[in-house]
Every structure is written in structure tokens, then in C-alpha cells.
Regions:
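Feature marking well-ordered beta-strand scaffolds used for ligand recognition
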Residues: 1-439
Length: 439
């Protein structure tokens, strides 16, 4: 008779050294002695928090930026030198999408029924609750027009100064990368379906200039292209620069490598798509700049796309969760998978906590050795060694306690500073600072 599986441990080789009870965040980015947190929508209407982490055991909030627009959030932040960029993206994106569908649907139902449709009939077709219809109607009456990104002078971290707001389009900007010269922005733009890449010259941050665009074939509707996929399933999530290349996660379109040696003419030089059969979309694609195991490899990580209730979790049982991919990119024209790394539902007591998500979401977007610091929503932080890229091995983990009133953690993002200190944020309240000591 088999013994029962032991209860999963909440931590291995990782210790929490401090914590701040800050609102849930979409990103934590560390530069020097400061951590920059981009917050998810919250009751305080807080956009960005800057934390002094020069003493990791005694972190100190030095400034916060509140949003004047209650319909937007700024859940991403990056800093180069004294320049900080944060995104501006629509709250309740799903409701906004339904608002776009409402006029056409109402016309269709009116023609079919010979009368005005009821809220219940509209809700059934839109796939929302009847109680959501007033919010959909409100979103239709007041179209969102604050999508874009903001550039701040943070020379004085205690007093960030807004330099410029760059408007884009649609629901606005999601995740992005930047360096001293350019910002690599994932945003909706007129004439395209779903997010595309727009590269801006930010050397004069008071006047960013668009340099070029890149998109997946089929996204440019105004150019006569037609998508071969439903809705916005194929789109850019974001792209990370490495040398003269951008590594792009493209949702259900898989991953792409983009040559930007001519910044005004980005071109695709590599592609790999594992959808189907794997159901969760490609979130982040990152180059590993040094040979690993004698190969040039890159890492991709999925995002477990939706929070599910208990009934939906049961219906999906047996399907793969979002995971970490190791890809051989030695020949960009023939990208090959080497390995995947998954976390078992048995390895977290919160894996089936509902409503919620369990699978992968993100990793630390810089790799200095062979350790990959990954976030699993209800699985917390997972530290994975890829010294043998064909056999990734977990060497540490940390599962935080759930935020008050939440059934489980929803670990969202991670960064690691040059001292090896780990910074972890949740979609619910909580900012954990950790240290990893392998045994």
C-alpha cells in the first residue's frame, strides 16, 4: 500500500527577511538601492511605490504616485538611470472589450427578436453576469482614452516629477522593456488587432519619438491583413532586448526573435509556437546571453491565463498548467525545445484554492548565472537551476501565506538585485523580501 503524499513544504532554502503590506502589484523592478512597484487596481488609486531597499531587512517607502484617473492602472514600472517609465492601461479590460461588442450585438438581437433585448439576453451573449451590464453600458458611454505611458524624472526618489505622458491607443500599454535610448512598448494602436510592438526614442524624454513598429502577420487590419485566429489570441505580450535582438512572448502565437540591428526596420528571424497542444499563452521570452551546457538557449514562461472557480478547475483537471520552457536557439531559423519545468499540484497546498490560478506567470528578466527565479501564482517562488538545460532542477522555493480574505497566494512578479536579494510581489497585498541560501 502506498503511503500518502506528505504535506508540501512552504519553503526550501529561502527565508523571508522583511515584508511591507503594500497593495497588490503587477511588477517589481530593482535598480541600485530602490525597488519600484507598479500596482494593480486598488482602493487607494495608487499607481507606483518607490521603496528604499539599501537595508533589505528594513525597507522604507520613500514616495508613492497616486493616479488622477480612476479608470486606469499603472501596474508596470522600469527605471534606467534617473528615468522611470510606467504604463497607463485600462481598468476592467474585459468589461471594456464587452462594451466594444455591445452596439453590434444589440442590433443583431433586436433584429432577431423583433424587440429590444433584455439585460439577461445581452449578458448571455456577451458571456458576463447580468449584474455586469450596467458597467458595460457605462464603459460604452465613456470610451477609454488614457492608454499610453508616463515618463518620470526620479533623480530625487522622494519626489518623482512627471516629464511627459505619451498617449498610444485602445486599452493602452501593458508590459515593456527599455534602455538608455529606446522604450520597447507593447500597446494597442489604431488599425491593428491586439498589442503590437512600438519602439520609441526616449533620449529626449520630454518628447518621445516613434521609431518603428513590429507585429504578427494578420494583426494589421488597416493594411488589409486578416487574422487566422479568434479575437486577440495572437498578440505581443512584451519583448526584451538582448544585443541586437528582441525576444518576444506572443501569447497564443508562441515566441519570436526580432532583429533590431536596424532599429527602424525590425524583422522576425526566429519563431516557435507550442500552441496547441499546450493551452496556456506565452508570457515572456528571454535570451540567455552565455552558452549553457554548450548551447545557446532562451527561456519562455507561460501565464496561467484566467482565475477559475472550483467548478471550472474541476472541468480543466488533467490539462497542463502554465510552465517554464527551455529552448535551443542556436539556429534561429530552427528553434527547438529542450525541456519544460512544471510544478505539481501536490507541491502547493493552495494549488486548487478557488477562485484563483495555480500555474506559471513570470520570471526574473535577467539571468546572471544558471538560476531562474520564477513565479507560480498559487505555487509561489520557484528557483530553477538550468546548468543542464535538458534537465532543469528546482533548488529552492517559497510559498507566501495568502493575503487576508484570499483563498491562496497569487504570486505575480519577482526581481533579484546584485546582492542576490529577492523581491516578490503578489496580486493581493504584500511585498516580500527574501534570501536564498542553498544547502
Amino acid at each position: 500500500m502506498n503511503a500518502p503524499h506528505p504535506a508540501p513544504s512552504l519553503t526550501k532554502n529561502v527565508t523571508r527577511i522583511s515584508r511591507l503590506d503594500l497593495p497588490g502589484a503587477g511588477q517589481v523592478y530593482v535598480q541600485g538601492n530602490y525597488a519600484y512597484l507598479g500596482h494593480l487596481p486598488n482602493k487607494q488609486n495608487l499607481g507606483t511605490t518607490i521603496v528604499d531597499v539599501s537595508e533589505p531587512r528594513r525597507p522604507r517607502v520613500v514616495s508613492q504616485i497616486n493616479l488622477e484617473d480612476p479608470t486606469s492602472h499603472s501596474h508596470k514600472a522600469r527605471v534606467i538611470g534617473d528615468l522611470m517609465i510606467v504604463n497607463s492601461e485600462r481598468n476592467m479590460t474585459a468589461i471594456g472589450r464587452k462594451a466594444d461588442e455591445l452596439p453590434k450585438l444589440r442590433t443583431q438581437l433586436r433584429a432577431a427578436l423583433g424587440r429590444d433585448p433584455s439585460d439577461a439576453e445581452l449578458a448571455g451573449k456577451l458571456g458576463v453576469a447580468v449584474t455586469d451590464i450596467p458597467a458595460v453600458e457605462e464603459a460604452r458611454r465613456k470610451p477609454y482614452d488614457r492608454g499610453g505611458f508616463k515618463l518620470y524624472d526620479v533623480a530625487d526618489r522622494a519626489k518623482p516629477k512627471l516629464i511627459h505622458f505619451q498617449k498610444t491607443h485602445g486599452i493602452g500599454v501593458h508590459r515593456f522593456d527599455m534602455d538608455a535610448n529606446y522604450a520597447y512598448i507593447s500597446t494597442e494602436m489604431p488599425g491593428y488587432i491586439g498589442n503590437i510592438l512600438v519602439i520609441y526614442d526616449i533620449r529626449n524624454p520630454a518628447k518621445p519619438e516613434e521609431v518603428s513598429r513590429w507585429w504578427l502577420p494578420g494583426q494589421h487590419l488597416a493594411g488589409g491583413e486578416q487574422p487566422t485566429w479568434p479575437g486577440r489570441q495572437h498578440r505581443l505580450h512584451h519583448a526584451l532586448r538582448s544585443g541586437d535582438r528582441l525576444f518576444a512572448g506572443c501569447w497564443h502565437g508562441g515566441v519570436r526573435v526580432i532583429d533590431v540591428s536596424d532599429i527602424r526596420k525590425p524583422r522576425t528571424i526566429g519563431a516557435y509556437n507550442y500552441h496547441p497542444p499546450f493551452p496556456e499563452p506565452s508570457h515572456t521570452f528571454m535570451d540567455v546571453p552565455r552558452p549553457t551546457g554548450g548551447r545557446h538557449i532562451a527561456l519562455a514562461i507561460d501565464e496561467e491565463d484566467h482565475a477559475h472557480d472550483a467548478r471550472e478547475m474541476e472541468r480543466r483537471r488533467g490539462r497542463p498548467h502554465g510552465c517554464l520552457w527551455v529552448l535551443d536557439v542556436t539556429d534561429m531559423a530552427k528553434i527547438q525545445p529542450l525541456a519544460i519545468f512544471q510544478v505539481s499540484e501536490l507541491d502547493s497546498p493552495y494549488s486548487r484554492a478557488a477562485p484563483g490560478r495555480f500555474g506559471a506567470h513570470q520570471f526574473h528578466e535577467r539571468i546572471d548565472d544558471t538560476l531562474v527565479y520564477c513565479t507560480w501564482f498559487a505555487g509561489g517562488l520557484r528557483i530553477v537551476d538550468i546548468a543542464d538545460p535538458a534537465a532543469p532542477q528546482e533548488v529552492g522555493h517559497y510559498i507566501p501565506e495568502p493575503a487576508p480574505g484570499q483563498p491562496g497566494p497569487q504570486t505575480n512578479d519577482v526581481d533579484v538585485d546584485k546582492r542576490g536579494v529577492i523581491y516578490l510581489v503578489d496580486r493581493g497585498p504584500g511585498f516580500d523580501i527574501l534570501e536564498f541560501k542553498p544547502r
